[in-house]
From Swiss-Prot:
Belongs to the ChdC family. Type 1 subfamily. This is Coproheme decarboxylase. Its cofactor is Fe-coproporphyrin III. InterPro entries: CHDC, ChdC/CLD, Dimeric_a/b-barrel. Pfam families: Chlor_dismutase. Keywords: Heme, Heme biosynthesis, Iron, Metal-binding, Oxidoreductase. Fe-coproporphyrin III binds at residues 130, 144-148, 171, 184, 222. The active site is at residue 144. GO terms for biological process: heme B biosynthetic process.
Amino acid sequence: MSEAAQTLDGWYCLHDFRTIDWSAWKTLPNEEREAAISEFLALVDQWETTESEKQGSHAVYTIVGQKADILFMILRPTLDELHEIETALNKTKLADYLLPAYSYVSVVELSNYLASGSEDPYQIPEVRRRLYPILPKTNYICFYPMDKRRQGNDNWYMLSMEQRRELMRAHGMTGRKYAGKVTQIITGSVGLDDFEWGVTLFSDDALQFKKLVYEMRFDEVSARFGEFGSFFVGTRLSVEKVPSFFHV
């Protein structure tokens, strides 16, 4: 039987995609819209405080295309905290006009495919930085879920640990070419959501998403074993831009 990869697990992650009921939003009196925006910004301010204390992180992006209008990406130490944040958002006045589009629940993950020493990895600063990341404030985001194929001779889970390690090492070398251009956060979701992993990419140049994903398609681990869900691409919605975004 093949050996399962051991994982290092960090913060829990929620990707919460919503569409905006603009028609209903436009019917609200201006004063009520402003009050709803102020209430939402107060909630975001709480998220900012948590992030400054390094007890979690968040990102808010508007989504390009028809799959969704807005994304709230939240990182927290526990699943319960994610649920509390989702509930708090749903209780706001603004949420009356935010319709569920898609969501993804996962946990920040590092695997043991790369060789490690005897030191406790959770005490290594670089490992901790990757397991408990402060999300980049880049102009653009790209998210997609993915699986490893389990069909015939292309069954990832029947490969030996050494075979999988070698394939992942080559895959990682491709990713390193984009260091400084793209920041990647991998979250594991086996038993938590419909796919096995979520991939979130951050960059100030959206074209780098296309270049990176395309080049990786030629890696054997992706060409033979990668299966992908829908891609979501968006632009950053800073606190300063929230009032103008919701202005009608």
